[in-house]
């Protein structure tokens, strides 16, 4: 018989840097999950990813206090900032352009995010990422 699901916890945790401090500790502690076990497993799973990249994770907590988790790819905005070399998006995206990104870089992000996005093909995913880039104040070239 399948285990009974108690709850889901959604967090963004830096790759390879999970530790029991907030937000991980309080979120898992109130559900009775072994925090150190999660931190060890998460850090092991994300050891090949660039340290510091925020990784969305969905933790399924079962009624016997055991858990499983799924890691996703970093948010598109984080990948766009990394590839365009900017620190943060523009607060006035219509009038203030703060960086440039080309279509080949957008395609690279779409390929990385392929499993997490709900696009039927790469072109549709690229359009979605272009929208994110425009809202951040990036100019799309090519």
From Swiss-Prot:
One or more lysine residues are methylated. GO terms for molecular function: large ribosomal subunit rRNA binding; structural constituent of ribosome. Keywords: Methylation, Ribonucleoprotein, Ribosomal protein, RNA-binding, rRNA-binding. It holds the Pfam family Ribosomal_L11. GO terms for biological process: translation. Transmembrane segments: none annotated. PROSITE patterns: RIBOSOMAL_L11. SUPFAM superfamilies: Ribosomal L11/L12e N-terminal domain, Ribosomal protein L11, C-terminal domain. One of its GO terms (cellular component) is cytosolic large ribosomal subunit. It comes from the Bacteria. InterPro entries: Ribosomal_uL11, Ribosomal_uL11_bac-typ, Ribosomal_uL11_C, Ribosomal_uL11_C_sf, Ribosomal_uL11_CS, Ribosomal_uL11_N, Ribosomal_uL11_N_sf. HAMAP family: Ribosomal_uL11 (MF_00736). Forms part of the ribosomal stalk which helps the ribosome interact with GTP-bound translation factors. Belongs to the universal ribosomal protein uL11 family. Part of the ribosomal stalk of the 50S ribosomal subunit. Interacts with L10 and the large rRNA to form the base of the stalk. L10 forms an elongated spine to which L12 dimers bind in a sequential fashion forming a multimeric L10(L12)X complex. This is Large ribosomal subunit protein uL11. The lineage of its organism: Bacteria, Pseudomonadati, Pseudomonadota, Gammaproteobacteria, Enterobacterales.
């Amino acid at each position: 018989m399948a285990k009974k699901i108690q709850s889901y916890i959604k967090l963004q945790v830096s790759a390879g840097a999970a530790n029991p401090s907030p937000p991980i500790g309080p979120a898992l502690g109130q559900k009775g999950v072994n925090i150190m076990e999660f931190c060890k497993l998460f850090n092991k799973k994300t050891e090949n990813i660039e340290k510091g990249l925020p990784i969305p994770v969905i933790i399924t907590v079962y009624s016997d206090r055991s858990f499983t988790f799924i890691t996703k790819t970093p948010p598109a905005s984080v990948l766009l900032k990394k590839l365009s070399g900017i620190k943060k998006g523009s607060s006035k995206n219509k009038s203030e352009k703060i960086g440039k990104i080309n279509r080949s870089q957008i395609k690279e992000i779409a390929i990385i995010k392929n499993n997490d996005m709900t696009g039927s093909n790469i072109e549709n995913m690229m359009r979605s990422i272009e929208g994110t880039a425009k809202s951040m104040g990036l100019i799309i070239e090519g």
